[in-house]
Amino acid sequence: MDVTVKWMDGAMFVGESGSGHSLVMDGPEDLGGRNLGPRPMEMLLLGAGGCAMFDVVSMLKKARQKVHDCRVDIQAERADAIPAVFTTLNMHFVVSGKDLKESQVKRAVELSAEKYCSASIMFEAAGVAMSHSYAIEEFGED
């Protein structure tokens, strides 16, 4: 996997993925940025959330669950000293659908955390205290 990150000016960088996509990262104004994009550390959390969400939604669809919507809310704490690495991270999945089986949602979240989500597993291997939780919301008619 290859990516390129190019400095634009101030604290703004443009990342280009090997799959041909670009994104802007920027810092806050007090650090020379213009706040035009997420911070690089936020990008790490967004990537982990996307990775885990891909797994969970895919597994629920394979289990023929009627998923209408899904999101993951991530709360992370960072060390006070530099390097300000992540120390704790919780992924809370909120899955809405019709007649969802809790056992299927629980299994999807657990399998993502323990086996499939490379990003989450990498955080855990680096010493981040990881936790995962979920909530199920019933959604009306199909």
Language model features: what each stretch is:
Residues M1-L46, V57-D142:
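Extended beta-strand/beta-hairpin segments
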